[in-house]
Amino acid sequence: MSQSRSEMRENSSQQPKKKRKGLKIFLIIVLILFIALGLFVWKIYSDVAGTTEKIHKDVKTEEVRDSSVDISKKDPFSILLLGVDTGDLGRTEQGRSDTMMVMTVNPNTDKATMVSIPRDTRTEIVGHGTTDKINHAYAFGGTSMSVNTVQNMLDIPIDYYVEVNMKGLQDIVDAVGGVQVTSPLTFSYEGYNFTEGESTSLDGKTALAYSRMRYDDPNGDYGRQERQRQVIQATLEKVASLSTISNYQDILGSLENNMQTSLEFNDMVKIFNNYRSAAGNIEQVQLEAEGTTIDGIYYGIVPDEEMSRVSGLLKEQLEIN
């Protein structure tokens, strides 16, 4: 039996209502998801801001610029990366800077330059009145003396510093879920084995062993610095990837316990927005030193030509005379 016209009109009028109701439910679900996402993003933002506030520490250094760098205007800038061997940063023992790297970032050239400084480099220790290994600057006067000494040696300004406890590198690598590196040589250290040319997954303990070995490397301190750069760069890339969002709190916790920096949260946001592309294009440079023994102590002596070469590269990137 066919439907009456009144029944057909009633059914047809109900269909749009059902569609409108379904659309309304869908929009409510989308709204809830957006609110949840917004709260999650705000939670991350708040946690990151809180962590950067805790790890922020200004140090007094000699001013060598006529005017301070302005990263909001995309000025080229420099950072001194210090890997220290004091264990936890709160320990009384000062320790030494096991790793020293200077990075310049220039958005105009869309390039970053990272210079590794051999820790045995013989230079004037500014503020201590001695000529010694550059890594002793940290033992004598902490971050401030290290910054002043590097500024004096390379004849460039150091705008910011980042100090990382090298023993805490284990916690940081574990927090990002491990890193992948390709070993430049075959060696064994602290029970871990690495094969030349073979891609290897490193957890925290393995990364620490990989980046510490020195005496079995034919390139000595240079070889170790190369491996340290590998681990640091792989860790930075992992931190910047979306794959670490789920465990971001572990990452922040590891940074909070093992890192100090003169960068504030707003600085980091500006660098991310204005310098992201340049920071992803890193040129690795090694400051070459010639080994010698003075009064029974081994030093690395940097020839004047080499110092001028590296200093010139950094000045060019910083766009200073």
Range-by-range predicted roles:
Residues 2-321:
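Non-catalytic, solvent-exposed segments at the cell envelope interface
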